[in-house]
Amino acid sequence: MTTKRKPYVRPMTSTWWKKLPFYRFYMLREGTAVPAVWFSIELIFGLFALKNGPEAWAGFVDFLQNPVIVIINLITLAAALLHTKTWFELAPKAANIIVKDEKIGPEPIIKSLWAVTVVATIVILFVALYW
């Protein structure tokens, strides 16, 4: 049986996500993947420059000292920190840790994740700069 009735199709604009702050923040958080791709490509080029000798490495370091590249890398760092913050806030929701018959709140888990991140960063910087 066929019908001539047209089904209702709710109109949806391409800017639907701009209406609520939750969706805007979600799109910003998902957009942190773009700077991550930039950093990955930059890291791969750095590895190839390191492999190709001192002249290639010096050229790569000169590239990194370009003010535009420094600004892009600072934006990438900010995006990585935002992504890390949101990921650390999500982790306690996935973990069900019970101590003495009581579920642990999200604060200790988030603080411990940040502590591990800070310690790992300090160790990596120490090894890179002083080893």
Curated annotation (Swiss-Prot):
Signal peptide: none
UniProt keyword terms in alphabetical order: Cell inner membrane, Cell membrane, Membrane, Transmembrane, Transmembrane helix
Physiological role: Two distinct, membrane-bound, FAD-containing enzymes are responsible for the catalysis of fumarate and succinate interconversion; fumarate reductase is used in anaerobic growth, and succinate dehydrogenase is used in aerobic growth. Anchors the catalytic components of the fumarate reductase complex to the cell inner membrane, binds quinones.
Pfam families hit by this protein: Fumarate_red_C
Annotated compartments: Cell inner membrane
Record keyword Acetylation present: no
Protein name per its UniProtKB record: Fumarate reductase subunit C
Domain of life: Bacteria
Organism: Shigella dysenteriae serotype 1 (strain Sd197)
Transmembrane domains' residue ranges: 30-50, 63-83, 109-129
MF GO annotations: succinate dehydrogenase activity
Family as reported in the entry's similarity comment: Belongs to the FrdC family.
Subunit-structure text: Part of an enzyme complex containing four subunits: a flavoprotein (FrdA), an iron-sulfur protein (FrdB), and two hydrophobic anchor proteins (FrdC and FrdD).
Upper taxonomic lineage: Bacteria, Pseudomonadati, Pseudomonadota, Gammaproteobacteria, Enterobacterales
Xref: InterPro entries: Fumarate_red_C, SQR/QFR_C/D
GO cellular component: fumarate reductase complex; plasma membrane
Membrane topology of this protein: Multi-pass membrane protein
